């Protein structure tokens, strides 16, 4: 008998800082997306894959936070990339924060409901709700906003009810002729992209609000010197000289510390010693 496969793709949508990246990391039980308190940390769509057995493949796509101001400022580039996904995905996760409903949430709902896809209202950060008695009235309020497929309260941070969300989606997967991705993959990111994200996370962690939104990290080379050691060369691109000074710091102290944090994280990821070279350049400058 021919093997049956079940697959489905869910796009994770919401305003900035509602915990989208934390949720995708929990859903696939692996850290592939940067988590930070800084708004607009996620710069592009990131795909995570959760394989259950050898038949079920749950695909999740983390997206940059949506806000009216950010969509306008970026001339819709990242926004268009996110909306382009809507034609090929099966489910939409609208991520909401605790028991609030804002104009931004309304704005996003009005955008995504036009695509006529099943929308799940995911109430995140329930670990921060002091009294769970406030949840039921909020769920009733949400049910009047739209005919949501499901309204599911979760905590991306603690993992509460993540298994319920995963199970609900698993039960709604469709039969497909073959898996979308190989069953040994957790993400569609290549190794250089993962390294770049690890470095960018440490820059965000250390520099915080000092860090320009426009920063980009590109991994140029990963060279295995031997079984126990690798050399990694990465470039941090910024818009202007002032941004370059912020990242480098006085006598190079900031970039050295960021490099040390990134190196330790990379050594943990690769389980080997890492020699990390970081260069900070202005965009459009060739090395």
UniProtKB/Swiss-Prot annotation:
Region annotation G1: where it falls in the sequence: 14-21
Domain Era-type G: 6-178
Lineage: Bacteria, Pseudomonadati, Pseudomonadota, Gammaproteobacteria, Enterobacterales
Subunit comment: Monomer.
GO function term, MF aspect, one: GTP binding
InterPro entries: G_ERA_dom, GTP-bd, GTPase_Era-like, KH_dom-like_a/b, KH_dom_type_2, KH_sf_prok-type, P-loop_NTPase, Small_GTP-bd
Function statement: An essential GTPase that binds both GDP and GTP, with rapid nucleotide exchange. Plays a role in 16S rRNA processing and 30S ribosomal subunit biogenesis and possibly also in cell cycle regulation and energy metabolism.
Swiss-Prot/TrEMBL keywords: Cell membrane, Cytoplasm, GTP-binding, Membrane, Nucleotide-binding, Ribosome biogenesis, RNA-binding, rRNA-binding
Name of the protein this chain belongs to: GTPase Era
Region G5: start-end pairs: 154-156
An annotated GO cellular component: cytosol
Residues binding GTP: 14-21, 62-66, 124-127
Membrane topology: Peripheral membrane protein
Naturally occurring in which organism (per UniProt): Buchnera aphidicola subsp. Baizongia pistaciae (strain Bp)
Primary residence: cytoplasm
Region of interest (G2), residue spans: 40-44
Gene name in the database record: era
CDD domains noted in UniProt: Era, KH-II_Era
Pfam hit, one: MMR_HSR1
Sequence similarity: Belongs to the TRAFAC class TrmE-Era-EngA-EngB-Septin-like GTPase superfamily. Era GTPase family.
Location of region: G3: 62-65
Residues covered by the KH type-2 domain: 207-282
GO biological process, one term: ribosomal small subunit assembly
């Amino acid at each position: 008998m021919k093997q049956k496969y079940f697959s489905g793709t869910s796009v994770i949508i919401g305003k900035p800082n509602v915990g989208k990246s934390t949720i995708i990391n929990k859903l696939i039980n692996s850290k592939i997306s940067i988590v930070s308190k800084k708004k607009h940390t996620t710069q592009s769509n990131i795909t995570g894959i959760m394989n259950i057995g050898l038949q079920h493949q749950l695909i999740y796509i983390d997206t940059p936070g949506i806000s009216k101001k950010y969509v306008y400022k970026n001339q819709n580039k990242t926004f268009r990339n996110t909306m382009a996904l809507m034609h090929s995905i099966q489910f939409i996760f609208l991520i909401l924060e605790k028991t609030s409903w804002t104009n931004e949430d309304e704005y996003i709902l009005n955008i995504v409901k036009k695509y006529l896809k099943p929308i799940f209202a995911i109430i995140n950060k329930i670990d921060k709700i002091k009294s769970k008695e406030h949840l039921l009235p909020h769920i009733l309020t949400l049910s009047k906003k739209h005919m949501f497929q499901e309204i599911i309260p979760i905590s991306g941070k603690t993992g509460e009810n993540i298994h319920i969300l995963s199970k609900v989606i698993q039960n709604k997967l469709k039969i497909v002729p073959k898996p979308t991705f190989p069953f040994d993959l957790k993400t569609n990111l290549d190794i250089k992209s993962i390294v770049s994200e690890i470095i960018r996370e440490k820059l965000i962690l250390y520099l915080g609000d000092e860090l320009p939104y426009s920063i980009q990290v590109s991994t140029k080379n990963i060279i295995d010197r031997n079984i126990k050691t690798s050399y990694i060369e990465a470039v941090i691109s910024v818009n202007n000289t002032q941004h370059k000074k912020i990242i480098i710091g006085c006598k190079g102290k900031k970039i050295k510390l960021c490099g040390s944090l990134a190196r330790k994280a990379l050594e943990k990821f690769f389980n080997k010693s890492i020699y990390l070279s970081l260069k900070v350049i202005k965009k459009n400058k060739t090395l």
